[in-house]
Each structure stands twice: as C-alpha cells, then as structure tokens.
Amino acid sequence: MTHDLAASGLRFGIEEEFFLLDASDLDIVRSAPAGFVAACRDTLGEHFAEEMFECQVEVASPVFSTLAEAARFHGQARQRLAHLAMDFGLRSLCVGTHPFADWRRARSNPAAHFARLFEDQGRVARRSLVCGLHVHVEIPPSHDRMAVLQRVLPWLPLLLALSASSPFRGGRRSGLASYRRALCGEWPRMNIPPALPDEDAYRRHLALLRETGCIREDGQVWWMIRPSSHVPTLELRICDACPRLADALSLAGLFRALVGEALGADPRALPVARDACLEENYWQALRYGCAGRYLVEGRCVGAGDWLEMAWRQCRPQARQGNEWAYQHACGLLEETSAARQLRRYRRLREAGQERHPALRRLVEELLEENLQPALAG
C-alpha cells in the first residue's frame, strides 16, 4: 500500500499514549521500575515523555510529510518501547482505557507540572486513567487557525467514532464506545471549543482565563481540537488511542485532508457558529461509535455515508497523500476497536471463561494488535 501514500503539502505529527503493565498479570503498574524512564529517554530521545500517571508514557513524533514516514517512525517506536518494557518486566499497551485496571491503583506523577494538575482538578484528574491519540497539522501563517478549526469542527465526531477503543472501564462494559471521552467531559475546557471566530478572539479568551486564575498556562485549554500553544498547528485531541497503528495513521490522514479542505475554501465561507447538531453527533459517537446515527445537512445518516460525504467534500489537493487513509477508514466502518473488543469478550464469555480471565485474554490480544505492521509493502 505504500505506493498510494503520495507526498502532501501539509506537514503533521502524531502523539501516542501508552499504559505500562506488569508483565505477570497485565494490570497497570503503580510505578515504573528504576531505570525504565532513563532507558526510554536513551532509546527514544526527545520523542519520549512521561505522563500524568506513573503507569503512562507518551511517544511524540518528529514532523512528517507523508503517512509512510509516520508508519516507519511509529512502527519502530512501538517496537522499541515494547522491547524496553519487556526488559524491565513490563508491557506497553496503546488503547483508550485498560479493560480491567482500577484507576485507584494508579500513582500520580510527582513532577511539579502534574502535581499542580492534580491539585487543581482533584478527583476528576485521579479518575482520568485514559490514553489518547493526538494529531498536529501545520497551518500556514496566512491562515487563521480558529477559522480553520470552526470549519473542521463539525466532522470531529466522525473521527471519534472511527477511533473508539474504550468500551471497558474497571473490568466492566461501560455501555459506551468511548468511555475515555465521557471521562474527558468531567474536565473543564476539554470538550467542544467555544465559537471564537478568529485567533484574536482566542487570544483574548486565553488572557481572560489567565487573568482570572482559571488557568495557569495556555496549555490548560484542552478542547477536543485546539490551536497548539507552542507550534503553528491545529491539534486534534478527540480520538482514543488506537491499538492498531494503521488505525491511528488513517485518522491522521483523514484529519489532514479535512484541514487541507478548510484551508482551500473561500475564507468568507468559513463558519463562525457551531452546527446545532454537533453535540448530538458527539454523543452518538461517544455512545455508539460507527453504529451511531448522525445528523448531517438536515438528515440522519450512518457513519459510512458520513465518511463518504467527508471525502467527497475534500478537493483533490486535500485528498493527495491521504487516499490510503480513506480506504482504511472504510474498513474501520465494519469493526472499530471498541466493537472488536466487545465481540471478542462476548465470544470468550460464551466459551465459558470467567470475567477476569476473559478480560486478561482481551488485553493479550490488544498487545498483539499494538505490534501489527501498519502498512503492507
């Protein structure tokens, strides 16, 4: 498939979050063993970062021009992290929520930045044992990032539906395709961004939040999509972490295509007010994933029709380099990670396994998916 991944004009980056598990029982560890973080920094360099819990880490990519570059980097990074983890008696798991871990066991990272976060958000932060996929797409300085954001925003529930990988919480079926996003909803400034028409309005809003003590720094605005505070990008934050790297690459390509379409549109046509159906579509994606019913252009459509509409809207220039992403997403419509986890769990229970052994087997299968090749040569 690599021959389909032609170069595209929009550069991008991907951040993936991982749980650290005890290799013996596949539950989260309270703390990483001594030397593990240092070994990760030696191996992954500036692309490795600690997270808010000691049982989590992040891999942040360099800047990419093609999905093939992203596949190579993240495929190697996943392999290196997995091998390092095994050297220390751990396993690394990329998924929205751990199927059976108890969030009460997770130990917060004592670093000052994270300590302030737990002080400010209390139990909301303590409960947020989740992993996400973040995608940055570069926005040229000639374009207003908030205007582009408002144009892309109505499509984001579709990307959540395709990424959903968190149907379990604490050993139980949550009833949601993305329980992670339900937990995100407990935080301030982590759901749908306000209808700010341009970056001037955005900067004024941030200044107000800082001056009134609502935030300590600009990075504490965690909307499902936001202008980055440190690089000239739009950052997609709505998606669950993807067990299969190919799924993550597909979502990155779709987001890049939608941003490319927004950049090529007549600026006068950029919407300044949110679609009235956005919140309903967000709920449908969070609850049902690709089985949801979505309100688009005055009618109810399935995720497959909505994906086709999104792709048809994109001009050829926006599609360039992202064709494989769309083709792969069409396959995700058949079964997302959330749907696959539920199907496998149901199969194991029907075969006579008790709840915990079935969930442990599910984690084993997710670990196998984490290391599947992203693209066929």
UniProtKB/Swiss-Prot annotation:
Protein biosynthesis is among the record's keywords: no
Catalysis: reaction(s): L-cysteine + L-glutamate + ATP = gamma-L-glutamyl-L-cysteine + ADP + phosphate + H(+)
One Pfam entry name: GCS2
Keyword ATP-binding: yes
Molecular function terms from GO: ATP binding; glutamate-cysteine ligase activity; ligase activity, forming carbon-nitrogen bonds
Family statement drawn from the similarity comment of this UniProt entry: Belongs to the glutamate--cysteine ligase type 2 family. YbdK subfamily.
Function according to Swiss-Prot or TrEMBL: ATP-dependent carboxylate-amine ligase which exhibits weak glutamate--cysteine ligase activity.
Name of the protein in its database record: Putative glutamate--cysteine ligase 2
Source organism per UniProt: Pseudomonas aeruginosa (strain ATCC 15692 / DSM 22644 / CIP 104116 / JCM 14847 / LMG 12228 / 1C / PRS 101 / PAO1)
Lineage, opening ranks: Bacteria, Pseudomonadati, Pseudomonadota, Gammaproteobacteria, Pseudomonadales
